Swiss-Prot record:
May play a role in DNA repair. It seems to be involved in an RecBC-independent recombinational process of DNA repair. It may act with RecF and RecO. This is Recombination protein RecR. Residues 80-175 form the Toprim domain. PANTHER family: RECOMBINATION PROTEIN RECR. One of its GO terms (molecular function) is zinc ion binding. It comes from the Bacteria. InterPro entries: DNA_Rcmb_RecR, Rcmb_RecR, Rcmb_RecR_Znf, TOPRIM_dom, TOPRIM_RecR. GO terms for biological process: DNA recombination; DNA repair. A zinc finger (C4-type) spans 57-72. Keywords: DNA damage, DNA recombination, DNA repair, Metal-binding, Zinc, Zinc-finger. The gene is recR. It comes from Rickettsia typhi (strain ATCC VR-144 / Wilmington). Belongs to the RecR family.
Length: 199
């Protein structure tokens, strides 16, 4: 795309968001600009407020308005179970299912089978420390069913072998190559309920 002016540059930026192409981005930008005093300024103000308020949870990596997120600080969560997810989008998908009441560990990345990425980017030392300090009984690996997600899962299983917690994976029903954020709540609930132990 030839980014010749400010509008084209804004369209290009929107097109880089997940799930948006050039056409969708153009529609969004033109919609915002049609009533910029209301729509565009409202969006800008909300983005500025989000930038000021949102922080990464010091414990799990979730995004929240507090240093310890509402999930980690809740008295109503099962503190003996941690689900490992790749991103906050997958955490939100698990929460939407309404079927998981434990804690989370957000990796922030996954490991590519072909690349030589440093596994420390997954914050696994912090996870292992949490497992020991918080006396975790079960770790549910809820990575995506993509090649990268599977590679990441196998690495995590090996890494956590020194901890006595039960390690399980989400059950079948998640298609190979599927991402948790795109699953309906029923499929994800079944995958959580029927999770399989990792041997």
């Amino acid at each position: 795309m030839n980014k010749t002016n400010d509008i084209d540059q804004l369209i290009y930026l929107f097109s880089k968001l997940p799930g948006l192409g050039i056409r969708s981005a153009r529609r969004i930008v033109l919609y915002l600009l049609q009533d910029k005093d209301v729509r565009l300024k409202s969006l800008i103000n909300h983005l500025i407020e989000l930038d000021k308020k949102i922080v990464k949870c010091e414990i799990c990596g979730n995004m929240d308005t507090k240093n310890i997120c509402h999930i980690c600080s809740s008295e109503h969560r099962d503190k003996s179970t941690i689900a490992i997810v790749e991103t906050v989008a997958e955490l939100c998908a698990m929460e939407r299912s309404g079927n998981f009441k434990g804690l989370y560990h957000v990796l922030g990345h996954n490991l590519s089978a072909a690349s030589r990425q440093n596994p420390r980017i997954l914050r696994l030392p912090e996870l292992l420390k949490r497992c020991f300090v918080e006396n975790i009984k079960e770790v549910i690996i809820a990575t995506n069913s993509t090649l990268e997600g599977q590679t990441t899962a196998y690495f995590i299983i090996e890494y956590l072998k020194e901890h006595p917690a039960k390690i399980s994976r989400l059950a079948s029903g998640i298609p190979i190559g599927g991402e948790l954020d795109y699953l309906d709540e029923g499929t994800l609930s079944a995958a959580i309920n029927l999770r399989q132990p990792c041997e």
